[in-house]
Curated annotation (Swiss-Prot):
It comes from Agrobacterium fabrum (strain C58 / ATCC 33970). GO terms for biological process: regulation of translation; translation. CDD domains: Ribosomal_L1. Binds directly to 23S rRNA. The L1 stalk is quite mobile in the ribosome, and is involved in E site tRNA release. InterPro entries: Ribosom_uL1_bac-type, Ribosomal_uL1, Ribosomal_uL1-like, Ribosomal_uL1/biogenesis, Ribosomal_uL1_3-a/b-sand, Ribosomal_uL1_CS. Belongs to the universal ribosomal protein uL1 family. GO terms for molecular function: rRNA binding; structural constituent of ribosome; tRNA binding. This is Large ribosomal subunit protein uL1. Keywords: Repressor, Ribonucleoprotein, Ribosomal protein, RNA-binding, rRNA-binding, Translation regulation, tRNA-binding. Part of the 50S ribosomal subunit. NCBIfam families: rplA_bact.
Amino acid sequence: MAKVAKRIQKIREGVDPNKLYVLTDAISMVKERAVAKFDETVEVSMNLGVDPRHADQMVRGVVNLPNGTGRDVRVAVFARGVKADEATAAGADVVGAEELVEIVQGGKIDFDRCIATPDMMPLVGRLGKVLGPRGMMPNPKVGTVTMDVAGAVKASKGGAVEFRVEKAGIVHAGIGKASFDAKALEENIKAFADAVIKAKPTGAKGNYVKRVAISSTMGPGVKIEPSSVTA
């Protein structure tokens, strides 16, 4: 336990929790402190000036990160016939209709993202209590309810990231791996921030982006000057 505490303390050294760093410096600090034996995920967190309890202040969307996420995303597609064949050809990991619904209802969720054709939604709607809390429910607003299942599968596999603001007004996402070069992480973070800004709801008043921070899986959070991310 003492060794673990000492290692954590060493990782946190040099990070001032009260200072706002420019994005490039923050990325360097996060990469330097990602010393775990696995390739840590780099996550960005944005605290927004919204109250998602109000419908006109909900923030959600999807962004295609220019350099991908660095993770293997397993995609499930609810479709029949030709569309099911298109999804399989595009690289979907799981494809089905009624039988897939039954599998998910049984508690087996061996995928990270769901896509459905519009005609499947009455059936998929039964899975709201299972997929909803996991943020996996297909939604036309983020392109996961579509007839272009092949395009949606390729986007999901290629770096598409969904985001949705949480109760505390925070939106976050994994935007790459610590092994990415600094420029790739910078481009991904700016793409994510740009998408969040474009998703600003009509009900948002005052300062929209309040705080921004990035961290690796096992590393400390590094606060960022918002203007260096949103510029």
